[in-house]
């Protein structure tokens, strides 16, 4: 890349970083480092791309002395590299390259009814995560300026099996504004999987559902209804992805199979649907 300007090098390197598959950031980062051959340029000019990647992927992080992980998201970003954990009420400095938290400091909770709503939602979300996500799930309810957002992340990284994947979802929860009755709840669900044994199959799926939920002054009852609605919608989405993938096995993958013997790929396309790409994350 010696004939390319530094600005163009940064643009190309940043694009590679921001599109790294789940669980493969280190491999992409090291490859970019070799291409740039300039650690100062990588450290000083590509750090924004690394931060965007971590925030966009809802990367989980463990805080010292805190039982459960929290997430790196736009909804708990305090700026200047600091984030906060809603459960422990601590803010921390996050190293986007090392993916480590440091300098924990007390962080004030939202006051009064806002924190009551947040705790009720977090209690029900914890139950849902424990019941439906395979060990690696993390769910956090963020409350900021009276606005509630539920973020969920789950991943399965299996490099020995040449397969990595991540599930993310976020939900804007319509509580805390004094309104009751049927309210609109908007969400976004994303799943991304990379299978790469003697071939390269990437699954990226996104859906932005809009649900109706009943909101009342009863914190616990409303929280249960909201998490139940999320559970139903995420199950519908998961089943639809699996069904579409099974259909692709009989259409798209069969068309590809005629060309694959030239590459001597080992993947059995007839059994593609049995690989359960995306399913093991939830």
From Swiss-Prot:
Location(s) in or outside the cell: Cytoplasm, Cytoskeleton
Gene3D superfamilies assigned: F-actin capping protein, alpha subunit, F-actin capping protein, beta subunit
Listed Pfam families: F-actin_cap_A
Superkingdom of source: Eukaryota
UniProt-listed GO biological process terms: actin cytoskeleton organization; barbed-end actin filament capping
Keywords in alphabetical order: Actin capping, Actin-binding, Cytoplasm, Cytoskeleton
Molecular function as annotated in GO: actin filament binding
InterPro entries xrefs: CapZ_alpha, CapZ_alpha/beta, CapZ_alpha/beta_2, CapZ_alpha_1, F-actin_cap_asu_CS
Entry GO terms, CC: cortical cytoskeleton; dynactin complex; F-actin capping protein complex
Family: Belongs to the F-actin-capping protein alpha subunit family.
Function: F-actin-capping proteins bind in a Ca(2+)-independent manner to the fast growing ends of actin filaments (barbed end) thereby blocking the exchange of subunits at these ends. Unlike other capping proteins (such as gelsolin and severin), these proteins do not sever actin filaments.
Subunit (UniProt): Component of the F-actin capping complex, composed of a heterodimer of an alpha and a beta subunit.
Entry protein name: F-actin-capping protein subunit alpha
Gene name tied to this protein: cap-1
């Amino acid at each position: 890349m010696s004939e390319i300007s530094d600005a163009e090098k940064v643009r190309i390197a940043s694009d590679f970083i921001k599109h790294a598959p789940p669980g493969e950031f280190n491999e992409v980062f090291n490859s970019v480092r070799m291409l740039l051959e300039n650690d100062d340029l990588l450290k000083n000019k590509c750090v924004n791309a690394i931060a965007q990647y971590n925030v966009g992927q809802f990367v989980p992080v463990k805080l010292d002395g805190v039982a459960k992980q929290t997430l790196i998201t736009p909804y708990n970003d305090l700026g200047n590299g600091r984030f906060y954990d809603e459960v422990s009420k601590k803010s921390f400095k996050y190293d986007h390259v090392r993916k480590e938290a440091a300098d924990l400091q007390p962080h004030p909770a939202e006051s009064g009814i806002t924190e009551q709503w947040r705790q009720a939602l977090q209690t029900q979300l914890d139950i849902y995560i424990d019941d439906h996500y395979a060990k690696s799930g993390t769910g956090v309810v963020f409350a900021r300026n009276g606005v509630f957002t539920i973020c969920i992340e789950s991943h399965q990284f299996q490099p020995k099996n040449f397969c990595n994947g991540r599930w993310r979802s976020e939900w804007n929860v319509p509580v805390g504004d004094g309104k009751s009755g049927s309210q609109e709840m908007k969400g976004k669900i994303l799943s991304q999987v990379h299978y790469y044994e003697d071939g390269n199959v990437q699954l990226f799926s996104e859906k932005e559902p809009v649900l109706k939920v009943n909101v009342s002054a009863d914190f616990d009852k409303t929280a249960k209804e909201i998490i139940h609605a999320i559970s139903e919608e995420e199950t519908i989405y998961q089943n639809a992805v699996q069904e579409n993938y099974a259909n692709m096995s009989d259409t798209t993958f069969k068309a590809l199979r005629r060309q694959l013997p030239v590459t001597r790929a080992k993947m059995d396309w007839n059994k593609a649907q049995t690989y359960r790409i995306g399913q093991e994350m939830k």
